[in-house]
Amino acid sequence: MSTRKKWVNSVDRQYQELLSDILKNGVKETKERTGTGTIKVFGRMLKFDLSEGFPLLTTKKMFIKGITYELLWFIKGDSNIRYLVRNGVNIWNEWPFQKYLQAKGLDKKYPKYSQEWSLEMGRFVEKVKNDIKFAKKWGDCGPFYGVQWRNFWGVDQLKWVIEEIRKNPGSRRLIVNAWNAPLVDKMALPPCHVMYQFNIAKGKLSCMMYQRSVDTFLGLPFNIASYGLLTLMIAQVTGYKPGELTLALADTHLYLNHLKQSKEQIKRKPFPLPKMKVERKVKSIFDFKFEDFELRNYQFHPPIKAEISV
């Protein structure tokens, strides 16, 4: 017999089950890029019905402002953190900052995550925010995500896929790909969420995203909400209702310094999902602004602090 009725929402339920799965079945990996160490599983899938509500976790408070601005940043085809930091979003600062330290020979002077490192990053961010020339030189994350969405060797994939949804909704080629192999080494971080595909059935637009690397505690909750919002946006501009969001997860891991936090989140009882109201109808996805979105009835547990691994 299904236990779904015992749960307030399937988003938190599936996420908590994934955390439990990793904690129980995960294999320890110490030889990974960041040096933090992980426990990981491989090949998992999440599926959400967007008609149930907006897929934003309630078992910890989520940074919806950051999720929305990051997605608008991707849609713009931008990769410079200046747009984000000028809007109070600091989720990508670590990568260009670390590159800056290495280029200046300061990475030994400011060890990662030390108090000195944090203070110096604050000064770096202020320069990016207020000095356009400095931002152009040091604030860029390279040709990742939005750059590839909007200019994959000259192809505006996002524009194309929306036009194709309108003209040929039965197509099996409604794909946007962020993995541009010759340019991966020029990116601050190669894309974790690599590609996504749309499908139209019974008047509903559904999205499936493939993710090669999944920071389950910090990154995945962002990714779920971001692709949920992207699906809502594209559904509106193409005249469909939102359908399902499916995530195919490859290397699905918890960093070793996130285990305690994960166990805490598993214990929390979910609230009902919120609703995302799109305040303004637009014809083009490129016309959306932050003010066009209103999150309603969002109940949540307190945030859980965790350190990002760079």
Segment roles from a protein language model:
Residues 2-310:
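Terminal, non-catalytic protein-protein interaction segments that mediate quaternary/complex assembly
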